[in-house]
UniProtKB/Swiss-Prot annotation:
GO terms for cellular component: cytoplasm. Pathway: Purine metabolism; AMP biosynthesis via de novo pathway; AMP from IMP: step 1/2. HAMAP family: Adenylosucc_synth. SMART domains: Adenylsucc_synt. Binds 1 Mg(2+) ion per subunit. Its EC number is 6.3.4.4. Belongs to the adenylosuccinate synthetase family. This is Adenylosuccinate synthetase. Keywords: Cytoplasm, GTP-binding, Ligase, Magnesium, Metal-binding, Nucleotide-binding, Purine biosynthesis. Pfam families: Adenylsucc_synt.
Length: 448
């Protein structure tokens, strides 16, 4: 190694994670931060969550490829912690290339990334159908079953595609197992071996130019002085270990997963940016202490909840499912901050609260008559949480597009200040609209 290489100051690495149940607006913030990054990394999840970007008024939804792909010259990485559907990947690549973006020469996929195969999707959908009203609310895209195979040490990985004979042998073995479950337990149809083999091997040559030793590349890029941005998917409260289990996703969505899911040393993660909306949302089943619902009909949102959903366009970017809405839950936020080691917060969708007469903040709970200031760990206990609120005056002025703290309405500043106090970490960024320019910067994650 040359003396000049030794003297290069390593780049700075920032991890972006959701602190709620996903859908916090991470995509826009990752895109904004990419101005100061030379690489963006996905380290967990699959194509079950969409990151929505509004650039110059044009809407783009990315499900698998890192949001940095929207910036020419930025390298994008899919780490070993991701589960990859080649079909979804090439569909997304095609959409981006049709929009005039270069993708393949800037996208690097870990050879150790687990593949999603047709039988994973079949099992996912058959399970949900069997559960009926008790379903968790998966997207049916095979994410969970693919992670099950990974933990069960039977997963097929990207690198396996390049040895057709071994791939075929292992695929046949896997199908013997999964088809038994599909037909004998779930009552579904068997997945055809030859059709699956032909489809998957057909991706091999198309994937090969993008396959890389991602862990090594990230190490070398960082030590050459280049900044890296690690883009989390879903949110902390959906984490397989730390979320409201079993109403969770199948991967670790917390900041620590960036190290394992991309193959980087944890000491290289310099700053953790926690993304929180100015209110809360949740998709699918599971407890939600601060949910806004009609007291006379708990299965329906109340009028404020409906307003938040409509103004905030709270519909899943991948599934189109409506999101449940509620006030910001600071007790849940504190739990996420502790788990992730959050350095600073970015509050998104502040503008959605414009026009409300009052704004509430959940600062704790009553659980069976006892006070609690932190979200419990189990779903059953979370379901017994009765929210304790502080109430703030609303603001009638529009905050849309404001990009300085002092220009915010006084009541909006008071609300944000109180959130900082109860959270115990600073709010470093505030989003006041979907476009990248509609952002207030208080401390820059790459410059702290």
């Amino acid at each position: 190694m040359s003396a000049s290489a030794v003297n290069v100051t390593p780049g700075r690495n920032v991890v972006v994670v959701g602190t709620q149940w996903g859908d916090e607006g991470k995509g826009k913030i990752v895109d904004w931060l990419t101005d100061h990054a030379q690489g963006v990394v996905r380290f967990q999840g699959g194509h079950n969550a969409g990151h929505t970007l509004i650039i110059g008024g044009k809407k783009t939804i990315l499900r698998l490829i890192p949001s940095g792909i929207m910036r020419e010259g930025v390298a994008c990485y899919i780490g070993n912690g991701v589960v990859l559907s080649p079909e979804a990947l090439f569909k997304e690549i095609g959409e981006l290339e049709e929009a005039g973006l270069s993708v393949r020469e800037r996208l690097f996929i870990s050879e150790a990334t687990t593949l999603i195969l047709p039988y994973h999707i079949a099992i996912d959908q058959a399970r949900e159908a069997r559960k009926g009203a008790g379903k968790i609310g998966t997207t049916g895209r095979g994410i969970g079953p693919a992670y099950e195979d990974k933990v069960g040490r039977r997963a097929l990985r990207v690198q396996d595609l390049f040895d057709a004979r071994t791939f075929a042998d292992r695929l046949r073995e896997n199908l013997d197992f999964h088809n038994f479950v599909l037909t004998q337990y779930l009552g579904g149809a068997a997945v055809d071996f030859q059709a699956t083999l032909d489809t998957m091997l057909g991706y091999a040559d198309r994937l090969r130019p993008m396959v890389a030793d991602v862990s090594r590349r990230l190490y070398e890029e960082n030590h050459a002085g280049r900044n890296l941005l690690f883009e989390g998917a879903q949110g902390t409260l959906l984490d397989i270990d730390h979320g409201t289990y079993p109403f969770v996703t199948s991967s670790n969505c917390v900041a620590g997963a960036a190290a394992a899911g991309a193959g980087v040393g944890p000491q290289k993660l310099n700053y953790i940016l926690g993304i929180t909306k100015a209110y809360c949302t949740r998709v699918g089943s599971g407890p939600f202490p601060s949910e806004l619902y009609d007291a006379d009909n708990p299965s329906r949102q109340d009028q404020i909840g409906i307003t938040l959903a409509n103004v905030g366009k709270e519909f899943g970017s991948v599934t189109g499912r409506p999101r449940r809405t509620g006030w910001l839950d600071a007790a849940a936020l504190r739990r996420s901050i502790q788990i992730n080691g959050v350095s600073g917060l970015c509050m998104t969708k502040l503008d959605v609260l414009d026009g409300l007469d009052e704004v509430k903040l959940c600062v704790g709970y009553k659980i069976d008559g006892e006070d609690a200031d932190l979200l419990p760990r189990g779903a059953a206990e979370v379901a017994r949480c009765e929210p304790v609120y502080e109430t703030f005056g609303g603001w009638k002025e529009s905050t849309v597009g404001i990009n300085s703290w002092d220009a915010l309405p006084a009541n909006a500043r008071a609300y944000l200040t109180r959130v900082q106090e109860v959270a115990g970490v600073p709010i470093d960024m505030v989003s006041t609209g979907p476009d990248r320019d509609e952002t207030i910067l208080l401390r820059h994650p790459f410059k702290v």
